[in-house]
Amino acid sequence: MLSAVIGGGLLAAGAVPGIGYWRYSAPGPLPETKALVIPPGGYASTIAALQEGGALRNDMPDVWIFRAAIALTRREGQLHAAELQFPAYGSMRDLLNVLRHGQPVRHPITIPEGLAAKQILTVLNEAPLLSGKIDTLPEGDVLPQTYYYLRNTGRGALVARMKLAMQRAVSHVWENRDPSAGLQDPEQMVILASIVEKETGLPAERPHVARVFLNRLRLGMKLQADPTTIYALTDGAGRLGRALTHADMGIQSPYNTYVTAGLPPTPICSPGLASLEAVAHPAPGDDLYFVAAGDGTHRFTPSLNEHNRNVSALRTVRGSGADMAPSVTHP
C-alpha cells in the first residue's frame, strides 16, 4: 500500500510511478551516526529537526514524501520527541523507525570513589546535559559509580537515584557483614569506610587498613588518620595541596582524629563498594599502626616501637621534612 501510494500518487512532488518509493527507501544524507534532539510540537518540528541535523534533505519532494509516509504508517506508532540516535545514511524508512521505536540516548556521568560532597556537587552542576541545580548534598550519601541519564534530566532526580543506590549497597553490605568486626551500626560502617577509601587506593590493602582502625577503636585509641585532618583543613573542598604539618595535627575540629577520639561526625567522602566491604569484612590481625612506604603500599605493625623504626627507615630513604608531622599512622 505504502509503495503504491508513494510511488504512484505523489505526482505533486514530481514523482513518476516508483520514484517516490525509491526516494523513501534510498540512503539519506547523514554522513555518520548522530544523536538529534527531536522537540515536541508535531510533524513540522520533527521534520525541521531532521533537516537541521542533516538526516533529511531540505527539498520539497523529500518533505512531501516524508509527510505522506508519516500519515500512511501512523498505525505503526506515534513519533517520539526525545534525543534519538539516527544511523548514517539512514533512509526515510529508517528515520521513521527510529522516531517510533528508537530508545532515547542515555548519557553517562561518573562519580569517582572518594569524592567529598562539595566535589560531587561540582561534577553534577557542571554536567551540561542535566537541568536544575543542587546546592547541598549530605556527605557520604551517594554511591560512587557511573550513572546513565536522559538529556534534561533534573539534577535532583539523578541525586535521588544515587542516594537510593547507596542505601541499597549499605543495606546489603551491612546485612552480610562479619559480626566480629564490631561495627555498631551502618552509619559507623560508612564513616569508617570513607576514611579507608581516602587512606589507600589499593583494594588489597583496604581490609588491612580497616582492621587497624577497628582495633584502635576497640582499644579506645585515637584513629590519627591524616585524611580526617585534611578534611577538617579544607572543609571537604578537596586536596590540601601540601604536606600535613605538626601544627595541622593540633587543630580543633571534630573531624581531626588526632585530637578527637572515635569517629568523625560524618563520612569524609563517598566511599566505594570495595571500601564498604573492607570495613564489613576486615582482615584478621592485631596491627595498630601503618605507614606509607612511598610506593603506594603501606607497612603495618602491631608495635609502636616497630612502627617508629619503619618511620625512621622511610624518612632516611626519602629525606625528612623540617616540619613533618609525627603521625602515629604515617611518617
Language-model-derived ranges and their functions:
Residues M1-T234, C269-A274, A278-D286, G294-P331:
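Conserved catalytic or metal-liganding residues and their short signature motifs at active sites
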Residues Q224-C269, A274:
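Conserved SxxK-family serine transpeptidase/carboxypeptidase catalytic domain
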